[in-house]
Amino acid sequence: MKKIVIIFILSILIFSCSKEKFEAHSENQFLMGTVCIITLYNGESQEIFKGAFDVIEKQDLLMSLQKGISELSKVNASSGIQAVSVSEDTYQVVQASKYYANLTMGAFDPTIAPLVELWGIGSDHEGQVPHKEEIEKMKSLIDYRKLEISDDKRIFLKDKGMKIDLGGIAKGYIADVVKEYLISQGVKRGIINLGGNIIVIGSKPEGHPWKIGIQDPFESRGTYIGIAEVIDKTIVTSGIYERFFYVDGKRYHHILDPETGYPVENDLASITIISEKSIDADALSTSLFVLGVEKGMDLIESIDNAEAVFVTKGRDVLYSSGANELFTLLDETYNEISLVQYLTTFSQ
């Protein structure tokens, strides 16, 4: 459920109403298997950047599946055997992952790790479709209802062989923690980009919203279909276009459906979530993609302070009730349509 998305950030130099010049200062490091970029505008010290990247590295050590010493790896190794005590951070992310699993009735399922490992999309052994028997075997290990979380911060997977994958939510949580750290250091404006999980802090110096370009799912990186104008928001996009392989002319992408065991097959090409917390945007972008347009729209309309932009394979763009106030479509090859129009067309 990991997602790598390219979101083009508009504006390098920011000017205040008084014509004072604010130059962007960016630092980047390769962490969590992706490029993490922090951009600040007030001449912050190098120590603040270092502290922010230290936060990312510390969190990754807790929840990464690629690090055998992580707390998450210890939980997975103890599945069917015993509960494992974890830190407050890991506890919060696992608890949030189960919340979204319940909310989506399993469309988002943190116990999907066995399937993710089997498909290996984005790994060195990608390129082959697993046998149906293998998929069914792994599916038997996926059930968020068998993930037990106790109030004393102990986590237990009831069946041996079960595993948790927080790839669809942890990066959002870490982005939120980085934002909290930067604000505690006096940062008033900036942009956090953790491999496509975008958080903007505050506004531009003159009080205007930041302008964030949203990737066109059918074009090369850095080509965007429109811009989101936001203040103190987070933006996360999931799509079929970043990690995939072809077999016999069919594309297999990395967003897996826990119910079928295969990559999601619906009419969506990408979905962008705009919300206040990146942990929510991260989980919702995957959840709504799995649910599809109709069920996804129903879910996003039931959630406060979160909006969605749906992009279909037919180049239609649909908005949740408040998204069109934040997002402007610039590419004229796309069509803005309502949910009613979409359902009428799609049913024909």
Can you say where each PLM-predicted feature lies in the sequence?
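Mature catalytic core of soluble alpha/beta enzymes
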Residues: 4-6, 15-348
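Repetitive helical segments and hydrophobic/amphipathic motifs
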Residues: 11-12
